[in-house]
């Protein structure tokens, strides 16, 4: 219940500033905050992609070793290891 009252008060406060001619300043500040958040998220995604590129050789090697222990051939695609039997015997 307290959250609803807080958000109602926040809406009233924002609308009061908007009516007072400060609408563009508030909107600019909100846009800047969302822009910074977007940049941080995109940087995090880029870091995650870089880590996955570094991790692929380790996962490929693990997959090959895992399948070799089963006397199969290992193939790793998109972090999914699949063991394939060669030869039909």
Curated annotation (Swiss-Prot):
Principal subcellular localization: secreted
Any one Gene Ontology cellular component term annotated for this protein: extracellular region
Taxonomic superkingdom: Eukaryota
Sample GO molecular function, one term: toxin activity
Signal peptide start and end residues: 1-20
Pfam families named in the record: Scorpion_toxin_alpha-beta
Tissue specificity as recorded in UniProt: Expressed by the venom gland.
Role of this protein: Inhibits voltage-gated potassium channel.
Family: Belongs to the long chain scorpion toxin family. Class 2 subfamily.
Listed name of the protein: Neurotoxin beta-KTx 12
Organism listed in the record: Lychas mucronatus (Chinese swimming scorpion)
């Amino acid at each position: 219940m307290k959250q609803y009252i807080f958000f109602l008060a926040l809406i009233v406060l924002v609308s009061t500033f908007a009516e007072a001619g400060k609408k563009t300043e508030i909107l600019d500040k909100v846009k800047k905050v969302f822009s910074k958040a977007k940049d941080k998220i995109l940087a995090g995604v880029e870091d995650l992609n870089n880590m996955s590129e570094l991790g692929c050789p380790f996962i490929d090697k693990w997959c090959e070793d895992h399948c070799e222990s089963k006397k199969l051939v290992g193939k790793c695609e998109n972090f999914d290891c699949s063991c394939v039997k060669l030869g039909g015997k």
